[in-house]
Swiss-Prot record:
This is tRNA pseudouridine synthase A. Its EC number is 5.4.99.12. Substrate binds at Y109. GO terms for biological process: tRNA pseudouridine synthesis. It comes from Histophilus somni (strain 129Pt). Formation of pseudouridine at positions 38, 39 and 40 in the anticodon stem and loop of transfer RNAs. The gene is truA. Belongs to the tRNA pseudouridine synthase TruA family.
Length: 269
């Protein structure tokens, strides 16, 4: 039997998704809980391997098991055996041809910036604090240069193991909600650190250090050393993974929850 899970986690205290020796990972904690509930070892496969300190509200995973449990039993049983910063939002029996990574058609991330002169004690994690005033409209304009299929070498980490730097960005929206600026980006897939590297350069534009057209120039140069430093992981969330409709997977609010579900309107401030 193949089971898919919708997972949410705060990545602050984890060295990323992937199991590694001598460090704590999300995969390790989830595999431990699943194996306990299933009463057999179960290897977990995820849609996107998030980096150290990165969060998720819409991670999707799957595993194979001989155990027979109801979807409700999987959800509540796993949550009872997971740490407080990892939660299962749904469980579903899926067809044998489903794969959390290879069946996915798109991934969507949100990057949250707390744009205020002073940091917040209530949100020491889960957002990236930026004290310099940012113009989200300029950031949004700059992001439109990245839409479509391009060579994203200028926004690719040196240690990236992907065979190609080509990716297809479906949308990139930047909007403000009170003191928060949200960068919402969806693509077929992402090269290593791509979202954080793009956000790093958008911050330069939003703060007035670079013009909007700089983003177009960076893209054409295909040189990572010319772009801005990588943005911190604190504000990055994997919020959605898209699959063909026939898998009929449940959907949750994109989140994170404290944002509510913002209405994006680029015709007004």
């Amino acid at each position: 039997m193949k089971i898919a899970l919708g997972i949410e986690y705060n990545g602050t205290h984890y060295f990323g998704w992937q199991r590694q020796a001598n460090v704590t990972s999300v995969q390790e904690k989830l595999e431990s809980a699943v194996s306990f509930v299933a009463n057999e070892f179960c290897q977990i496969y995820c849609a996107g391997r998030t980096d150290s300190g990165v969060h998720a509200t819409g991670q999707v995973v799957h595993f194979d098991t001989k155990a027979i449990r109801s979807e409700k039993a999987w959800t509540f049983g796993l949550n009872a055996n997971l740490p407080a910063d990892i939660a299962v939002r749904w469980a579903k029996v899926v067809s044998e041809d489903f794969h959390a990574r290879f069946s996915a058609t798109a991934r969507r991330y949100r990057y949250l910036i707390y744009n205020h002169p002073l940091r917040s004690a209530l949100f020491p994690t889960g957002v990236t604090h930026h004290h310099v005033a940012l113009d989200h409209r300029l950031m949004h304009q700059a992001g439109q240069y990245l839409l479509g299929e391009h060579d994203f070498s200028s926004f690719r980490a040196a240690q990236c193991q992907s065979n190609t730097p080509w990716r297809n960005i479906h949308h990139l929206h930047v909007f403000r909600q009170a003191n928060y600026i949200i960068v919402d980006i969806q693509a077929n897939a992402f090269v290593h650190h791509m979202v954080r590297n793009i956000v790093g350069s958008l911050l330069e534009i939003g703060s007035g250090k670079q013009p909007v057209e700089w983003m177009d120039w960076l893209l054409t140069q295909k040189d990572r050393t010319l772009a801005a430093p990588t943005a911190k992981p604190d504000g990055l969330y994997l919020v959605e993974v898209k699959y063909p409709n026939h898998f009929n997977l449940p959907k949750n609010p994109l989140g994170p929850l404290f944002l509510g579900e913002p209405k994006i309107d680029f015709n007004h401030d």
